[in-house]
Amino acid sequence: MLELSDIKFRYPKGEYFQFSYKFDLLTPVVIQGASGSGKSTLLNIIAGLISPSSGYLRFEDKNLLKISPSERPLSVLFQSGNLFDHISCLRNVEIGLNMRSRINSEEKFIIEEVFQNLGISDHKNVLPTEISGGQRKRIALARAIVRAKCLGKKLMLLDEPFNGLDFETKSECINLLKDGCFKEGYKVIIVSHDNNDPTLLGANRVKLENILR
């Protein structure tokens, strides 16, 4: 379970975000809401990119607000993808594990498997600037999945992970996530504008409304 209790964050212009909720995470969660409703703010608080002024954020009996972002059990996919354009797609995924050390043989096998499952094996040695937006999105998703598999960072925060994907590719990505939830215990929270996603994922839908004051 992921529990947010009386989380408050004040924006620079004075408006503040206030939110309490218990996510059981037994199935994926899809967060939806109008533009500006606080969806990205919520993910950024969980990820530790912004700090609330009050409240607590509890996951597996730990208050994540007392844990540095790098130590939290998270695998994050940002809406922009956050890929480094000057290094290969493969290296973009590898640095999700370790910025400096070598990747071991087991990790290499997992990375290869994830690339194959996402249909991006042909793009391992090219730069992100040389592939399409949908392919870039799959590289970013691969990095999140590899972190979950190799580092045990199984709370996955995915911001619009299916943007730019055709229906067939999207279905493959969804099936891979569902399989990970069932077999490996991923806990998945997705921000999505697509009203079909909760049904496709078999997910609980949480709509953000009236949480900005």
Regions found by a protein language model. Give the residues of each.
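Conserved ABC ATPase "signature" region
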Residues: 63, 105-123, 178-179
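Catalytic Walker B motif of ABC-type/P-loop ATPase nucleotide-binding domains
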Residues: 152-160
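Short coil-to-helix segment of the ABC ATPase nucleotide-binding domain corresponding to the Q-loop/switch region
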Residues: 87-96
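Helix-to-loop junction immediately C-terminal to a conserved catalytic motif
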Residues: 47
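Helix N-cap at the start of a conserved alpha-helix in ABC-type nucleotide-binding domains
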Residues: 167-169
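ABC ATPase NBD coupling module
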Residues: 63-76, 80
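ABC ATPase nucleotide-binding domain "signature" region
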Residues: 30, 139-148
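Conserved ABC ATPase signature
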Residues: 127-131, 135
